Amino acid sequence: MHKLVDTCDYPGFAMLVYRRGEVVYEEVTGMMDVATDQPLQKDTLVRMYSQTKPLACAALLMLFEEGKFLLDDPVSRYIPAFGKVKVFAGMNLGGMRLVDPERPMTIRHLFTHTAGLSYGFDPQHPVDRLYGQAKLIDLVSYGQMPLAEMMEQLAQLPLVNHP
């Protein structure tokens, strides 16, 4: 953390590890406000983004510890629609060329962001355009679509690469 702050890649970090009811590690380094040279404090309020990922992973790993699933279980065991997913393999005269995945998408792939799912950020990529047009995350976030339905529709979209 110190190296990232020292090289000015990030203004500051706060980290706390809590295990079995006790704080086992806590560190704060860097600036809360670089312009005013105000240091980051333990009680500084900050904006946090994309925090559902670590929370979901922590909850899932608790279930993993209980033996409820294995990391190499296929996603299709829990969401059958992912058993029919296709992978983008380029464009041809008829449009997108789709192929079967080289291996099944697993829980491990989801944890490591190697499942082949797109974020929809690149408007030049045909698969990203489809993800962006589907607006699935927005529909779920604003309560306009149940999560189960979103998963069914997500499985209809091609993967940007093989898991």
Q: Which ranges hold each PLM region?
A:
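A cytosolic small-molecule/anion-sensing beta-strand core signal
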Residues: 19, 25, 65
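Generic structural motif
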Residues: 20, 32-34
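Short hydrophobic alpha-helix segments
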Residues: 27-29
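Gly/Ser/Thr-rich helix-start
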Residues: 13, 31, 117
